[in-house]
């Protein structure tokens, strides 16, 4: 992945080092594997490719956020500056408190915590994400916009343009076929409704 990022002309690479606990998921956990950690460190140096962020620090009631700490520590040692996360519950009081704990944990290692909204997740649109960032009131927490998901959430360019720059740290510039919003959301929700 690091080599491909370099060959494709990117300035940074992102690595998914926090497991999703999915069936058949490959193990890619440098925090638990000293050889893998050393190999990643060597590849970053060989290809002159800085590690920008790791993912995905999900906020869900069935996940223990303390499992993220070793991943944050390893990422910081590899030069990362950021963590990407998302929220998977509609319990606002709980997810706000828990997101604050994740942000504080990230800050221990000099990392910024970027929260992505998705129209079928717990934080579903730009305004909900901004509200969460405001409620947290921490200087290392930002809104993360994935342009594909933002479009599916009904976010417009004008809405983004009106949003103060302070909320944004980086974006995911993604594209793909865009079925009508309701069709897209209904299809995805049918697949993940038991997770929310």
Where are these regions (language model features)?
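Acidic/histidine-rich catalytic cores of soluble enzymes
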Residues: 1, 101-196
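Active-site-adjacent beta->alpha loops and helix N-cap segments on the catalytic face
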Residues: 91-101
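A conditional alpha-helix N-cap/helix-loop micro-motif detector
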Residues: 33, 64-65, 95, 122, ...
């Amino acid at each position: 992945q690091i080599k491909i990022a370099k060959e494709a002309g990117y300035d940074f690479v992102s690595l998914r080092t926090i497991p999703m606990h999915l069936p058949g998921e490959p193990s890619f956990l440098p925090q638990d594997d000293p050889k893998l950690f050393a190999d990643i460190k060597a590849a970053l140096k060989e290809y002159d490719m800085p590690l920008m962020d790791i993912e995905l620090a999900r906020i869900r009631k069935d996940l223990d956020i303390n499992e993220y700490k070793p991943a944050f520590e390893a990422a910081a040692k590899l030069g990362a500056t950021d963590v990407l996360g998302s929220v998977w519950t509609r319990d606002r009081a709980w997810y706000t408190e828990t997101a604050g704990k994740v942000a504080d944990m990230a800050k221990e290692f000099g990392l910024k915590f970027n929260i992505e909204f998705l129209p079928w997740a717990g934080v579903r649109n730009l305004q909900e994400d901004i509200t969460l960032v405001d409620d947290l009131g921490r200087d290392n927490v930002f809104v993360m916009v994935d342009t594909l998901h933002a479009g599916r959430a009904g976010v417009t360019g004008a809405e983004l343009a009106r949003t103060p720059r302070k909320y944004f740290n980086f974006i995911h510039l993604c594209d793909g076929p865009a079925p009508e919003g309701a069709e897209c959301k209904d299809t995805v929700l049918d697949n993940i409704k038991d997770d929310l």
